[in-house]
């Protein structure tokens, strides 16, 4: 997991997922630091709320050597699958074969802002069909297809990946069917915003069901935990930053997922009501530290390592995706200031030097 000198080396992968809300120069610098430290990948969310990940990663391609790039997640309601493939293959060429993608139906809150009635449009069936379209188009560079959601006649592209097989993984939160489909057809599953042993046992149990149904070995899949993280020597400051930021993620979490953390969604309704009324400060204040502790990985490097080692890896997760947050990001979301929290580059260094080595010798379950 780490050589002990601050460079990441492990059978358990460690990656960084950014929210591209910083200046392009600052974002590229963060990516360069992650590359130099040996992180497996730099991912980014693919949402209208943030800057464009495809342009950012194209700009970072020739400034890095080993780190992989891709959306985590991109989505198949607001984006067309073959156009995602065109972007991926172009990025793969620019990076010399370092592109991949995690694909889902999309952020439900954002789709509501687009007035997309996604729930009545068979989202998982659409995603499954999109994964078939994308795999075909990436592998063959052309497609003829007549599906329930996507149709193509004689479509082709000059955008071809460098890799023999560009990895396509699925993103999922609620389950269980999305977890099973990922086990059946995808190169992996990345599960966002869970932090409990119960949640990850549930995820992996259903990935296994899908893999078994397809005659696949689930242990060969990339099984990621996408977690909001703040790493600092000032434990209280890290936890306060995480508390503020995580409050904004809660509305995206299905009730079933909250229940796997011992949280009844009805407990959070007053907070949701405050957000809906536009009273952000009140909503954040109603999200207490005890809830934030359940729904983030924050604290000293050693505290973060302990939570990952105890609650996440034992289920069989083999990829930790750190969605790191710092003071500028907290202020952007909430308007509130926090102190005692390092910038992203310094958090990447702290994690590589102390958090990841603290997990050495504790591989994910076989």
What is each of the regions a protein language model found here?
Residues 1-366:
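Active-site-adjacent structural elements that line small-molecule/cofactor binding pockets in enzymes
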């Amino acid at each position: 997991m780490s050589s002990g000198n601050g460079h990441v080396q492990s059978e358990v992968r460690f990656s960084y997922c950014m929210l591209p809300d910083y200046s392009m120069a600052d974002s590229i610098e963060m990516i360069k630091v992650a590359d130099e430290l040996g992180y497996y990948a730099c991912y980014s969310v693919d949402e209208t709320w943030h800057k464009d990940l495809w342009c950012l990663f194209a700009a970072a391609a020739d400034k890095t050597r080993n780190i992989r790039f891709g959306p985590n997640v991109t989505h198949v309601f607001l984006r067309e699958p073959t156009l995602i493939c065109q972007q991926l293959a172009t990025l793969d060429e620019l990076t010399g074969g370092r592109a991949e993608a995690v694909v889902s139906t999309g952020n439900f809150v954002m789709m509501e802002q687009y007035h997309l009635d996604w729930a009545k449009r068979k989202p998982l069936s659409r995603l499954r069909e999109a994964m078939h379209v994308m795999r075909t188009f990436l592998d063959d560079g052309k497609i003829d297809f007549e599906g329930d959601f996507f149709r193509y006649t004689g479509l082709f592209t000059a955008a071809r990946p460098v890799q023999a097989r560009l990895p396509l993984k699925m993103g999922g939160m609620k389950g269980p069917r999305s977890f099973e489909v990922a086990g059946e057809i995808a190169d992996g599953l990345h599960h966002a915003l869970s932090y409990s042993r119960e949640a990850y046992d549930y995820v992996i149990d259903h990935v296994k069901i899908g893999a078994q149904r397809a005659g696949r070995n689930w242990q060969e899949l990339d099984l990621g935990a996408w977690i909001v993280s703040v790493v600092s020597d000032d434990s209280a400051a890290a936890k306060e930053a995480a508390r503020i930021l995580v409050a904004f993620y809660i509305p995206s979490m299905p009730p079933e997922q909250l229940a796997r953390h011992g949280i009844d969604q009805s407990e959070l309704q007053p907070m949701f009501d405050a957000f809906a009324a536009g009273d952000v400060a009140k909503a954040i204040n109603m999200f207490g530290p005890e809830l934030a502790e359940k729904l983030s990985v924050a604290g000293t490097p050693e505290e973060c390592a302990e939570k990952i080692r105890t609650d996440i890896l034992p289920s069989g997760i083999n990829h930790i995706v750190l969605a790191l947050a710092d003071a500028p990001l907290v202020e952007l979301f909430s308007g509130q200031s926090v102190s005692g929290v390092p910038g992203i580059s310094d958090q990447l260094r702290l994690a590589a030097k102390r958090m990841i080595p603290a997990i050495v010798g504790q591989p994910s379950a076989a």
